[in-house]
């Protein structure tokens, strides 16, 4: 099949309409990327429609070309398109989106609900905490998306909002106690860091509804008793969670975002999901 489309591309025909269902079927990841590239080039002079369950075929460089189909008991089947200006204003921003949204992060488009987190420690910790609460997030269709730092959380929240994807955001507050710092140079550095984090925190508070915004104070390391200077935070997070006896033993900072996203997608803890 790929050879047919490649040949069509090579002979430079224009004005065709292609409709392809599940182009990822029977293709390993490398071939999926290759096929996606061919279809993207074909779309320059033709119309290409694909339906997919593969994150590989989602190209956020042109977000206006992505249509998200969702189905639930309340609304039935709905289709959601976004305006380009809702997400990107410049070519530079479009290229950033293409870079940020890899296959793992593109999972959000297939999720019933999403928890946006800063880094790898949280990405590991929330599913583990869910299991301690007898909540298998995969079974409920919930994805934990690591955004590569606090500075990127707002971008992901804007994309989710534009496409109507239910989400919550979990971020470190990262505000240091200046009164506890005696060294003048260290205090000056901490003041600058506080100002930077305050700016990012304010931007998140201004965009994300309060009921969807959760803060680790001052950060996840403090909440979970992790050494900030270690290079093995995930192991320490695992040991912290492994020692917990059940849902009542999980810190509120971990528990509340999980419960909030479940409420947003209409799931009660006692409900059995449709497998």
Walk through the language-model features, giving the residues of each.
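Switch/communication elements of ASCE P-loop NTPase nucleotide-binding domains
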Residues: 1-104, 271
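Acidic, divalent-metal-binding catalytic cores of TOPRIM
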Residues: 67-275
């Amino acid at each position: 099949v790929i050879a047919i489309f490649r040949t069509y591309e090579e002979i430079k025909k224009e004005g065709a309409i292609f409709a392809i269902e599940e182009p990822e079927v029977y293709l390993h990841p490398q071939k999926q990327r290759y096929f996606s590239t061919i279809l993207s080039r074909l779309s320059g002079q033709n119309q290409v429609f694909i339906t997919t369950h593969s994150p590989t075929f989602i190209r956020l460089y042109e977000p206006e070309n992505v249509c998200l189909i969702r189905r639930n008991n309340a609304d039935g089947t709905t289709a959601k398109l976004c305006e380009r200006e809702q997400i990107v204003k410049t070519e530079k921003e479009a290229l950033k989106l293409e870079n940020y949204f890899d296959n793992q992060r593109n999972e959000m488009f297939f999720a019933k609900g999403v928890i946006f987190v800063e880094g790898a420690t949280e990405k590991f910790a929330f599913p583990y905490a869910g299991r301690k609460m007898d909540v298998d997030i995969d079974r409920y269709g919930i994805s934990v998306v690591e955004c590569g730092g606090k500075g990127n959380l707002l971008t992901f929240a804007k994309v989710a909002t534009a496409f109507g994807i239910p989400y919550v955001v979990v971020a470190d507050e990262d505000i240091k106690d200046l009164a506890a710092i005696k060294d003048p140079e260290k205090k000056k550095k901490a003041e600058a860091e506080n100002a930077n984090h305050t700016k990012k925190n304010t931007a998140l508070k201004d965009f994300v509804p309060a009921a969807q915004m959760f803060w680790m104070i001052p950060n996840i390391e403090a909440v979970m008793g992790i050494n900030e200077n270690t290079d093995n935070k995930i192991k320490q997070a695992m040991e912290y969670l492994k020692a917990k006896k059940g849902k009542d033993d999980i810190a509120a900072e971990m528990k509340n975002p999980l419960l909030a996203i479940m409420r947003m997608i209409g799931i009660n803890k006692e409900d059995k999901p449709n497998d």
